[in-house]
UniProtKB/Swiss-Prot annotation:
Residues 1-23 form the signal peptide. GO terms for biological process: cellular response to amino acid starvation; meiotic cell cycle; negative regulation of TORC1 signaling; positive regulation of autophagy; TORC1 signaling. Pfam families: HTH_NPRL3, NPR3. This is Nitrogen permease regulator 3. The keyword Signal applies. The gene is npr3. Residues 115-129, 842-853 have a biased composition (Polar residues).
Amino acid sequence: MSSIARPPDPCLVAIILIVRSRAGPRFVFHYPPNPLSENGLRGAPKARRPSRKNSKSNESSSSEDSSSTSSEDEDEAPITATAAAPATTGTATQPANATQNASHVAGSHPVAGRRSSNFGVVDDTTISGSPGGESQRAGSVGSGRGLMMRKRGTNSDAEEDAGAASDRQEDEAGPFRPPWESLLGLPADVWEKLLSPSRSWHKRRFEVGINDLAFVGWPVFVREDGTWRKQRRKKRKPRATWEGGELGHNETPGDGDGDGEGDEAGTEDDSPDRGTELIAASTETLSPKQMATTDSQRASMISVRSFRTLSEALDPDDKDCMTMFNVVFVLDPPLLEYSMRLREIYDNIIKKFSKALKWEQARTDYVWKEAQHISHIKEKAKEKRMSVNSLYSELISQSSLARAICTVFTSISASKIASVSLSPDVSISLQIPPLTSTPWLPGPTDKAYPGLWLTTADSVTPVDDPTADENTAPHQVLAKHFALLLLDNEASILKDVEASGGALAPALAHYIRCSKPTKSFAQISVSSGIPLSTIQMLASHLVYWRRARAIPPLHQRDTYIVSPNCDLSKLEVATAAYQAAFPTLPSLPKMLSAMSGTPRPYGSFIPSKDHKDTYFAILAWLLRGGWVTQLRAFARVKISPEIKMAVETALRQEEVDKYLSKRGSASDTEIREDLDDASSSSSSSLGSNGSGDETPMPGRYKRNNELDLSHSLLDQNTSLKTSSLILYPHRASPLESRWLGEVMARFPELQGDVPDGDLEYAGLRTSLKKYWPTFIKYFNGYDALEKIPVRESLKRKLVWQILMRLGLVTGQQSSIQLDPREQILKTVQFFTKTIHNFEINKTISPNPASSHVMTPRHTDGRNGTTPTN
C-alpha cells in the first residue's frame, strides 16, 4: 500500500497515424477502432464525458487563436533547466471537404466542466501553434469563442493528394466500405488532409480543435537531402543503438538532431558526456541493449546512412518514399483543465513517442515499412471483408508499430507506464508523472487526494537554490541527503528486478539490499562502496518506475504525527495488512492513537534498543501508506525594536564621527581660504563697475563638512517601535545585514571549554557565534530546521541544543538553563489536527518578549503566522 496518487485522467480518446508519401497523405492506422463507442475493443470510460447525440451540423469550431499553443524544439533537458528557443508562430487552415453527417455513441459518464458535443462534419477547422503561449479551450459550434476562419477554397497540396484521391474514389465506388476507413463519423480522406500539415510544422506542436476534441501531434518531415537526421559536422563515435528510453528525457539544450528548421543544434550527436544521460536513461527500461553499442550495430548504422545517397533520396521516379509522419493524439480534456492536460500529454507522451519513431525511421526506415505493412494487411482484410475485431487482432499481432500504439493508448488511458518495444534494439517507456506528495492541505473547493504524502521535503528552497521561490518545481536530480523508501515489499521488488534481467538488474538488486530509509544516499555510498552517482541513478530508476520514493532519512530525534491527509476509508484494510506485517507489536489504531498525542520525537515510542529496527520498519510502513508525516520546524529572524534602535544609534554615531573627522582635517585649509577670499574680494570690488552681486550657484554655500544624514542606511519608513521579519537572510539588505550583525554581537562569549570526548552537552557550552553564520541561512521560513544536521554534517543533539538556546521550544527544556541574552527565537506551534476517531491536540508555546525569530512547526509548509509585538 503506497501513497502515490494516480495521475489525472489523461482524457485520451484515440491515437492516429498519418504518413505522407510522394503519392499523397495516407490515413494508416488508428486505435481504438471505435473510440467513442462502448462496442469497441476498449470499452468507453465510465466517467468520461456527457453522452453525445446525433448531429447534422456542417460546422465546427476553430481551434484557439494563434497564441494558444506552444512550439518547442526537439532539444530538451528535463534534468537541467530547459531552454528551448522560441519558434515562429503561425496559423493555417486546413480543408475538411466532407458532407455526410456523423453520429456515434459516447461513454455514459459525465465529468464536471465538460460540454456535451455534437461531433459532426467540419467545414472550417483551424490549426494553430504558438511557441510561447499556452493552449486555450477551443470554442464549440456556435459558441462564438473560437476564432472562425475562412474556409480555404483550394488545396495547397492538390498535386500531392491527386493520386491518393483517385484511389479512394475507386474504393468509394465499390459496394463495400470498410468500417475502419472512417473515424468519429468522418471518412479517412478528411483526416488525411486535416492532420497532414505543411513543412512549416516540422517538429512543432501541431494542434487542431474540433468541437470539444483536441488533435495534438508533433509532425516530422524528411530533410531536403532525403535523410531523417542531419549528418555529423564533427567526427565522433557513432551511436547506433537506442540509449535513452524516452528521447528528450536525456537531451540537453546543446544536443539534438539538428533537423532543418527550428533546430538550434548544429550536430547530430548528443554530448559525449554520458553521465547525465545514463542517469536519465536508467529510468526508462532494464533492457541491456540500452547500455552498450555493438560493433555490428554501429556498422549497420553507417551502412544505412551511406546507402541513402542524395541522388537516391531525391530521385523523381521514386514515388514510394515517405516524406512525413504524424502521430496524432485525440484528447477530450475538461474545459477548465484544457491547457494543463494538453501540456502534460504533449511533453511526456506525444513528443517523446514521436522522437523514438523518428530515431528508428532514420536508422531502419521503420515507420515507412510498418505503414506499408499495415496498409497491406488492411487491403487483404478489405478483400476478405473481415470484421473490425479480426483485423485489429491481426494488426496488433503482426505489426510492431500498431502494437506500440495500442500499448501506449491502453497504458496511458489507465494512468500506467507504457513500456513499448519498437524493435529488438529500441525500447521506450512513457508515463504522465503521478502525484507523489503535496505541500498543502486541500481547501473546501480543492480536489482532495486522501492518503497522499503531505510534506514540503521535496520542494525547492532558498538553500537549494537562492533564486528559487515557493512556486518553483521540485528538483529533478535526487540530492545526496535524501534516503530511499521502497513502496512495496523488498522481496517482491527484488523478484521483479531479477525477473526483468538486463544490465541494471545486478546493480539494482545490490543497491536495494544495501538501502535503508534511515541512511542517506551519501551514507549508503560510504558503507556499501557504491559510487554516489550510481546510487542516484539507481534511485532515480526506482522512483521513475513508482517502486520507491525519496524522503529525508528517518531518525529517532525527528517528530512524526498522524497525517491530516490520511485516508480513513482504508483504515480497516490497512489494519489487517499491518497486523500481518507486525503481529507481535501494537496494532495500527494504537500506534496512530499514540502518535496523535502531543508531538514528541519518535525515539520516545521505542521501548528499547532491541526494538529500534522494528519500530523504524513500522515508521517506514506508516509513511509508505501516507498515515503519518514528519512535523518540521521553520524559522524566520525577528528583529526587535531594541536591535533596531541600537543599529540606528550606531549609524548616526558613524555619521557624526565622519563629520568630525572631515571638519578636523579641513580646519587649517578653511582659515587660509577665508584669508584668500577676503583679499580677492576687496581687490575685485575696487576694480569692478558692476553691481557686486555674485552669480548664484547650486550648493555654493553648502559646506562639505556639514552633518548630512540623508544617506543613512535606515529607511525612513521603517518604524523603530515595531519588530520586523527578515524574509531572506541570504539576500539581506545592507540595513538587515547590520541588524543581523548586531544580533550576533550580543551573543555572550564562550561559556567554557568542552572536554575532549564529552559531546553530551557540547551544544550548551559552545559559543553561538561559532555556529550563527552556518545556521542563519536556514532561518528563511522555507527550509526546515531538521535539514541543518543532515546538510551541515553536525550531530543532531548538538544542533537541537543550539536551537533550544536560540529559543526553539521543545519538550526537553525544563532541565536546561537558558541565557536570556541568547533567546532570539520566537516559536509558534500550529494546531496539530489528527484523524477523527482518535483525538485532537494542540500545543501553544510560550511567547517570550525578547524573541527575535519566529519558528512555526507544521507539515504543510505554510508560514501564515504574524508575530505580535
